[in-house]
Amino acid sequence: MNSRLCYLLFRPRLLRSRGAGVLSVPETQRVTLARVRHEESNSAFTNSTLRSDVGHDTGLGLSFCRSFSTEAIGQLQSTHYHLVYTCKVCSTRSMKKISKLAYHKGVVIVTCPGCKNHHVIADNLKWFSDLEGKRNIEEILAAKGESVRRVEGSEALEIVNEESRNNPDEQKPAHLSDGSDKT
């Protein structure tokens, strides 16, 4: 990706010296130019290439442009998971966006939109003693003989009961069995 940043430093009208017709730069402008050149020499960008150009005096102002290009180092990592699950209480299928940090190092509790029940998805801080040391939904369901399917391309966790995966029509809730499948 190439980017170009340009800064235009305007100064008041250049004064013409009385003798030889030479342009003179006021003291404040010399300090600004010196500061710009100092910043150019001290600036270093580790992940980009930098080229600085100081324009010539055109009588309108001093132009200062920086051109740099940055290239992605590796891939950007998503910071969230999309949790897709079916509530066992009311059979509502829903999707929630949860933080990866909370899932792996904190506590995640989601609320079912159908029955308003709270479901523990992850407990890495050991807040809930009834989980018997299990830290996340994958470990909780593995102890019950169920599985969690990870879909890496879309950063999603899908909770699927093994029986419903083998017999999808038998486990379908009554409000979805009439052919009006929600997606």
UniProtKB/Swiss-Prot annotation:
Zn(2+) binds at C87, C90, C112, C115. A zinc finger (DNL-type) spans 76-173. It is found in: Mitochondrion. GO terms for cellular component: mitochondrion. Residues 160-183 are annotated as: Disordered. Its main location: mitochondrion. Keywords: Chaperone, Metal-binding, Mitochondrion, Transit peptide, Zinc, Zinc-finger. GO terms for biological process: protein folding; protein import into mitochondrial matrix; protein stabilization. InterPro entries: Mt_import_TIM15, Znf_DNL-typ. PROSITE patterns: ZF_DNL. Pfam families: zf-DNL. One of its GO terms (molecular function) is protein-folding chaperone binding. It comes from the Eukaryota. Residues 1-62 form a transit peptide. Residues 162-183 have a biased composition (Basic and acidic residues). May function as a co-chaperone towards HSPA9/mortalin which, by itself, is prone to self-aggregation. PANTHER family: DNL-TYPE ZINC FINGER PROTEIN. This is DNL-type zinc finger protein. The gene is dnlz.
